[in-house]
């Protein structure tokens, strides 16, 4: 892979977010249900920009010791993403599975506490928490499946035909693609760092696709 293409992918977690944010800024109004997604986009932009700046410039500009690793930011990003999309799914006007959705959110909180108490170190400079990101992807996938299950059982559900559909579909694709990336990332990092770097490109491609689906959702609100 050429240096130019590598540079594009290295910064993809930043510029990909600018696409849906641009669509958001163009719109005069957005559906209230999309507010958690908009909040996520802005927070993700700050977090991802911080991640890339640390990765690209920590050596050149001699960042202090506590800024020599961006892995803790990935842990923060995982928690932020789950919190925003958990709120998004719980807020959907779908009466079924309400308590189950709340239970999923509680499971994530309990898992995170146990994980960082007994298994992982939150501020680990060597790697982000594969356990955390894997659990996040799995639970978000359950949210997506519950959404589709409700939509299949209710043909009149307007949420299955608008911007919410595009967001859930994009999120579902993102977590399905990256579940195994997160699951085996820490092991691969220890055994073959070069392969791990190449596999992370798959994550970046999935993230670009995810952002394009969000853009499609926001564009739909602009047209309407």
Residue ranges with predicted function:
Residues 1-224:
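Terminal, non-globular segments
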């Amino acid at each position: 892979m050429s240096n130019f293409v590598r540079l594009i992918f290295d910064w993809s977690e930043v510029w990909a977010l600018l696409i849906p944010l641009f669509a958001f800024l163009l719109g005069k109004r957005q559906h209230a249900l999309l507010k958690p997604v908009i909040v996520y986009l802005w927070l993700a932009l700050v977090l991802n920009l911080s991640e890339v700046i640390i990765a690209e410039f920590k050596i050149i500009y001699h960042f202090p010791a506590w800024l020599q690793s961006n892995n803790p930011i990935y842990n923060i990003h995982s928690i932020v993403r789950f919190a925003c999309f958990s709120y998004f799914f719980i807020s959907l006007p779908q009466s079924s599975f309400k308590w189950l959705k709340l239970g999923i959110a509680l499971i994530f909180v309990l898992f995170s506490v146990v994980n960082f108490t007994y298994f992982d170190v939150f501020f680990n400079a060597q790697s982000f928490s594969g356990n955390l990101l894997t659990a996040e992807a799995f639970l978000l996938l359950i949210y997506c499946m519950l959404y589709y299950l409700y939509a299949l059982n209710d043909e009149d559900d307007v949420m299955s035909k608008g911007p919410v559909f595009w967001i859930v579909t994009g999120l579902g694709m993102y977590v399905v693609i990256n579940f195994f990336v997160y699951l085996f990332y820490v092991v691969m990092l220890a055994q073959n760092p070069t392969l791990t770097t190449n596999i992370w490109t798959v994550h970046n491609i999935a993230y670009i696709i995810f952002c394009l689906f969000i853009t499609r959702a926001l564009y739909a609100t602009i047209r309407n």
